[in-house]
Amino acid sequence: MNKNIVIKSMAALAILTSVTGINAAVVDETQQIANAEKNVTQVKDTNVFPYNGVVSFKDATGFAIEKNTIITNKHVSKDYKVGDRITAHPNGDKGNGGIYKIKNISDYPGNEDISVMNVEENAVERGANGYNFNENVQAFNFAKDAKVDDKIKVIGYPLPAQNTFKQFESTGTVKSIKDNNLNFDAYIEPGNSGSPVLNLNNEVVGVVYGGIGKIGSEYNGAVYFTPQIKEFIQKHIEQ
């Protein structure tokens, strides 16, 4: 082959590689800017609290509340049965906190979209701290209450398949509270169903059930943990 042709081909390849790298960097930077505008950050280490209190379903989120007990939504639990599995705080790594079988599902009898699951204590696949659920997953405590304008955060797995089960945190404020419903403006997407809504002390004030995926929306909703909701949860915590 002509030496000049080889040199030109190598130069063209170098330029293409360089441009591709630049494009990838631009896409990544654009995504980071978009997330910053939404007050969303990717969690780097899910083995520390509060991130290790969150669990993943195939297309939704849940979180631990005391021994072997998980909270999520009824519209999530309806797709699961006893013996199905959940994964503890993955972050692109399905075995990060262990994989556990569900052994009981209790849906709230009212209209509120909340469900309590109990899982087997011993993992099907071990986590970073062994096979025990309670050693790999740190449970949240209930907040005493919440009020309008409180700062909150939502932790979960938005678009889990697309984001390869990476965990994200979004921040915002409480916009309204009425009965068992809490509205907030932290950004959420499909997959955030079942995410904990936490105050600045990382105490849980509610569980996300839905939203409209719009920046600044005040219509993202959570089941607010009123005394009657807390009582239901307490009755279904494994003793």
UniProtKB/Swiss-Prot annotation:
Signal peptide: 1-36
Catalytic activity, EC: 3.4.21.-
InterPro entries to which the protein is assigned, alphabetical: Peptidase_S1_PA, Peptidase_S1_PA_chymotrypsin, Peptidase_S1B, Peptidase_S1B_tx, Trypsin_dom
Keyword match Thylakoid: no
An annotated GO BP: proteolysis
Annotated disulfide bonds: none
Keywords: Hydrolase, Protease, Secreted, Serine protease, Signal
One Gene Ontology term of the molecular function aspect: serine-type endopeptidase activity
Principal place of residence: secreted
GO cellular component terms attached to this protein's record: extracellular region
Active-site residues (renumbered): H75 (charge relay system), D113 (charge relay system), S193 (charge relay system)
Transmembrane segments: none
SUPFAM superfamilies: Trypsin-like serine proteases
Annotated localization: Secreted
Organism superkingdom: Bacteria
UniProt family annotation: Belongs to the peptidase S1B family.
PANTHER family: PROTEASE DO-LIKE 5, CHLOROPLASTIC, SERINE ENDOPROTEASE DEGS
Official protein name in the record: Serine protease SplC
Organism encoding this protein: Staphylococcus aureus (strain bovine RF122 / ET3-1)
